[in-house]
From Swiss-Prot, chain B:
Organism of this sequence: Homo sapiens (Human)
Subunit: RNase P consists of a catalytic RNA moiety and about 10 protein subunits; POP1, POP4, POP5, POP7, RPP14, RPP21, RPP25, RPP30, RPP38 and RPP40. Within the RNase P complex, POP1, POP7 and RPP25 form the 'finger' subcomplex, POP5, RPP14, RPP40 and homodimeric RPP30 form the 'palm' subcomplex, and RPP21, POP4 and RPP38 form the 'wrist' subcomplex. All subunits of the RNase P complex interact with the catalytic RNA.
SUPFAM superfamilies referenced in this protein's UniProt entry, alphabetically: Rnp2-like (SSF160350)
GO terms, biological process: tRNA 5'-leader removal
Pfam family name, one: RNase_P_Rpp14
The name this protein goes by in its record: Ribonuclease P protein subunit p14
InterPro entries for the chain: Pop5/Rpp14/Rnp2-like, Rnp2-like_sf
Note: This protein is produced by a bicistronic gene which also produces the HTD2 protein from an overlapping reading frame.
GO CC, any one term: multimeric ribonuclease P complex
Keyword tRNA processing: yes
Amino acid sequence: MQTGPYYFVKNLPLHELITPEFISTFIKKGSCYALTYNTNIDEDNTVALVFMITSRNSPMIVSIDLMELSLNLDSKKYERISWSFKEKKPLKFDFLLAWHNTGSEESTMMSYFSKYQIQEHQPKVTLSTVRDLQCPVLQSSELDGAPEVSCQALELFDWLGAVFSNVSLNNEPNNFISTYCCPQPSTVVAKAYLCTITGFILPEKICLLLEHLCHYFDELKLAPWVTLSVQGFADSPVSWGKSEHGFWKGGEHLYNFVIFNNQDYWLQMAVGANDHCPP
Amino acid sequence: MPAPAATYERVVYKNPSEYHYMKVCLEFQDCGVGLNAAQFKQLLISAVKDLFGEVDAALPLDILTYEEKTLSAILRICSSGLVKLWSSLTLLGSYKGKKCAFRVIQVSPFLLALSGNSRELVLD
């Protein structure tokens, strides 16, 4: 399953994202996303294109609704915004871009931004197999776990982090270096498959991935559950929906699906201290 | 037999994490000194002891991962001890007479957040 491509454009003037041509070619014919590359939201100007352009350099936030703007491109509002981006404050950024085309024509980002050194990238995929992995025992109906029977959802969340960070899971309580161990009760699985996909990935691709995972249990499987974790960019100025995203000690905003073999699921959403509660 | 109606439960936790996790890296100004995991941990303990004393040096601190080649590690500290550990790392200036500094790369109450770092995204 393809999870890309995404694109990188160097020194793209910000006004290029509000031109009538860009809006009609990409915004109106699919879902277009952009994020400035290598800008730290707690230090620099940062721009994101989701359903609107949001620019943030604490404490100033500028939000522009492109769909609303496109309804009247002769308006004074559009003229002012255009003038601001072209002349008053002509900002340029390196952008990551991705586009989900729902139109019938074959417009491409590569040809559209050809004068701006655009590069196409594919998300990096790493696969690994872990043998004899200690896994927490879960019961889909018990989010808080049950003593001696199943683990809490929070314990699973941290355990996933341990697995993906290659943390040792069976340290003795008197070990000087680390006392971390797998939450109990646990079971040992002979083989676990881990897949990491890194890049600027469209939500539509993630939905497809989730669908594939849901179909994993269409046939009888030994595995009791599978998980899909998604991490947002730490320097995105927006989080869930249109909520502003912040970076205090960290810029974490992530979610994790746990899909059980009985078609129950858990959805865990986590945000940092500077973010609003997810919907 | 008809399937039972789907049930839905939403639970919101605020500050649920007992622990905080830090991804750190030790950098030497000139040529480095090799440290194994035990020496690395001892360095962290003595940094906290120098600033806050014996009692706080006994804060539960785990080195979840350690890479000797790059002197980088993922640490786990009880949330109440995060500020003390972080400030101790900030003020540590030398090891065995050699100038060094800790770089704090990521901090989160969620270990899963440390499995990736978008600030380290490199485009080929």
